[in-house]
Amino acid sequence: MFVADNSRDTPGASRQMNDPESISEPRLLSRRDQSLRDAHPFKARWMPVAFLAAAKAIGQEAAETNAPVQLQTWNWHAQNTDIVQYHPGFTAPYSGPNSMSSVNEVRETVSLDLYAGLRLWKGAEAHVDGLMWQGFGLSRTLGVEGFSNGEAFRLGTDVPNVNMARLFLRQTFALGEGLEPVEDRPFALAGTQPASRITLTIGKMSAKDIFDNNAYANDSRTQFMNWALMANEAWDYPADSLGYTTGLALELNQPQWAVRYGFFQMPRTSNGTAQDPHYLQAWGMVTEFERRYLWGTHPGTVRLLAYLNSANMGSYQAALETPVRPADVEATREYRYKYGFGLNVEQEIVKNLGAFTRIGWSDGRNEAWTFSDVDRTFTLGLSIKGACWSREDDTVGIAGVFNAAATVHHEFLAVGGTGILAGDGTLTYGIEKDLEVYYDFQVWKTIHTTLDYQLVSNPAFNRDRGPISIFGARLHWEF
């Protein structure tokens, strides 16, 4: 999977879910000032890092010779993330086709992105992201709903694979005279942007780049690794098995609020790589309202999200009504709807300490299609910057996750049904409960390493299995 991410300067920081920074609205110049907040590959050693650093320095030096209002014509960036995870053996009286292995296991993932941006005509930019990735999630990325590695795609590979993850055009229309500074980063060219604006983004991207962002829990490359802590898991957001899709997003942004709408293509099969060509029948729509405010002197943001998907989905109830066992939801597929809602809150409590939560609900009647099997989710966490102990670029995070399935959904799983992540052959239903704690340590400027621990109770909604302890380490660099 995937997803969008915030800069490391953001208190607390994709894809993005293996995503880079949000492409929706370029963040303001000072990312440590929360009051200004708007709103995979071969190994790193295969890339000549010295060359990257030298070229980047030349580009930065050239940019610094220009006046602050000078618009950057083009840019490029790169990132690499390596994650290793291990879990010891755990209690499991039985296993199914989608179970996490109950014996000890080690897996790794590697991602490398090369980003480039070009300013076109007035208000227009084009951006591209070439992704190379390699590796596997634990147990082929199965058996846990709040999966432990946001860099782990369902489409694992032993050798490096290449994909054009993003290729999109962004056009901004000014609604007033006021301007805001924009920093140089992936998917944003240094310069200015209108403070009041309409923004149209069209092309290939991640829906998570634009929607459901959070300053403290958004990016598995620099923050929490758990899927439920980088996105609202009850939002079955449009994406292929790598986390990307084609579509468009329209945004109205004002200094204190924003409204967004997106229309995206859906995959032909559940968590598939090929997109469904029936554009009038297979689509995902999402709307988000964002309100930015100050709580005393501490900034906060509330986002409300609603979505409606249409795809060739099976019905859990229809599968239960057939005599076939294990229950087969694929045999009941026809074009159906799925809808849901989400709440996303981030709040600075005191300087260097922020809190966040996500709450999500979906109807849960029809087949999980793109992200996970979760129908209800609640997450709550804290992010602490290392300035408290004279390590201002370090971060500590701790968060809890509660993931649940709708009644008809877990009844389907109990008679042998399988989903995107769940499928133990049967189950004694229980809410999955996850805990994640991480320490992100700055090694040198843009090079960071992270130690991570996760505890999963009732994995994939099954009280008969687990708990599972998952230990992880991450190396991340970016230019």
Residue spans of the language-model regions?
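Signature for the C-terminal beta-barrel architecture of outer-membrane proteins
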Residues: 227-345, 350-355, 359-366, 373, ...
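Transmembrane beta-barrel strands of outer-membrane/channel proteins
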Residues: 76, 80-84, 128-132, 200-204, ...
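Short loop/turn motifs that connect adjacent beta-strands in outer-membrane beta-barrel proteins
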Residues: 61-76, 88-89, 117-126, 174-197, ...
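Transmembrane beta-strand segments of Gram-negative outer membrane beta-barrel proteins
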Residues: 68-95, 100, 198-200, 222-223, ...
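Surface-exposed coil loops of outer-membrane beta-barrel proteins
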Residues: 142-166, 176-288, 327, 416-427
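Residues that define the transmembrane beta-barrel architecture of outer-membrane proteins
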Residues: 72, 106-112, 160-165, 242-246, ...
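Outer membrane beta-barrel transmembrane domains
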Residues: 290, 305-335, 356, 363, ...
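Residues on the lipid-exposed face of transmembrane beta-strands in outer-membrane beta-barrel proteins
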Residues: 78, 112-118, 167-171, 202, ...
